[in-house]
Amino acid sequence: MKYLLPSAAAGLLLLAAQPTMAANTGGYATTDGGDVSGAVKKTARSLQEIVDIIEAAKKDSSGKAVKGGAYPLVITYNGNEDALIKAAEANICGQWSKDPRGVEIKEFTKGITILGTNGSSANFGIWMVNSSNVVVRNMRFGYMPGGAKDGDAIRIDNSPNVWIDHNEIFAKNFECAGTPDNDTTFESAVDIKKGATNVTVSYNYIHGVKKVGLSGSSNTDTGRDLTYHHNIYSDVNSRLPLQRGGKVHAYNNLYDGIKSSGFNVRQKGIALIESNWFENALNPVTARNDDSNFGTWELRNNNITSPSDFAKYKITWGKPSTPHINADDWKSTGKFPAVPYSYSPVSAQCVKDKLASYAGVGKNLAVLTAANCK
């Protein structure tokens, strides 16, 4: 099902006018990005202008390079790449071999926020490398080119303390002839790997993506703490996320149309899967493709409470020939440790009924609370 996400208010409002507030991401991230004292605020109309603004912020007034950045940045992006997105949609199978397009935030730790205006759009990604204190909000990413060359929408490499909030990421969830190893035509929506940790992914609308996201790039890239909350995943294939070790807290998400597998908890990781809504899903919680180093999960207050609910919500299970564990008894296999942040989950039913009015772009960063569930 494709969700029609209503706008929180009419008109194209510049979100740069939002007041500064202390970071409360509802998860492991604790960053305000660049929206702090001393921030320089800029407006960009294109990928290249974002790149130029970031590069300028790496130098002081004399032009000397400053390690980690010379000042915090808030970049308001008001560009529109709908024409490129429409052209990509008309030539889906031609996107794989193209060069990827993206903004690289490299070795920038001073703090940076990239904030899209309502009505903006991007046919490019945002890639973080050896950075920290990064916030990406209200950006609409569509049909990223360069799947053969790791053309992710969001990539977080060795970059702690990142908040990905109120974005829309979309592609086409089918296979084109000629892509290798039965791989995807498009790359990931949000990959978090190579030492990245303390990341919150919230209020995003992700649809038509085959491989949604990694937590860790290999069996030795483990140990991160991630939170996913209030996201809508529709018509997706797998990796929600593919978790290699560490801790994942996922609450108040809506999963509709999982075609292969959802949570894949590997390398002795643990996931708290709390107050979510699942429907039309194949293998929504599993551990597979990992020899015997299976992870564990705690299932808490989801719309599914026992196997008797599977038929009602169209939950099905597959049994691969390789070692695996499915949550087909819908029982917890581990106990998640206490989280270091405060959060107030709403009921799974409220997620089903109300989340579409809050997740994604054009919602003026509105959040869903219990008061909205009445």
UniProtKB/Swiss-Prot annotation:
Q: Could you give one GO CC term from the UniProt record?
A: extracellular region
Q: Does the keyword Nuclease apply?
A: no
* Positions of disulphide bridges: 93-176, 350-373
Q: How is the cofactor bound?
A: Binds 1 Ca(2+) ion per subunit.
Location(s) in or outside the cell = Secreted
Mind listing the GO molecular function terms for this protein? Answer: metal ion binding; pectate lyase activity
Do the record's keywords include ATP-binding?
no
Which EC number applies?
Answer: 4.2.2.2
Q: Per UniProt, which keywords does this protein have?
A: Calcium, Disulfide bond, Lyase, Metal-binding, Secreted, Signal
Among Pfam families, the record links this protein to:
Pectate_lyase_4
Q: Which residues bind Ca(2+)?
A: 150, 152, 187, 191
Q: Where is the signal peptide?
A: 1-22
Superkingdom of origin: Bacteria
Q: A GO BP term, please? A: pectin catabolic process
Question: Required co-factor?
Answer: Ca(2+)
Family under the similarity heading? Belongs to the polysaccharide lyase 1 family. PLADES subfamily.
The free-text function statement in the UniProt record for this protein reads: Involved in maceration and soft-rotting of plant tissue.
Q: What is this protein called?
A: Pectate lyase 1
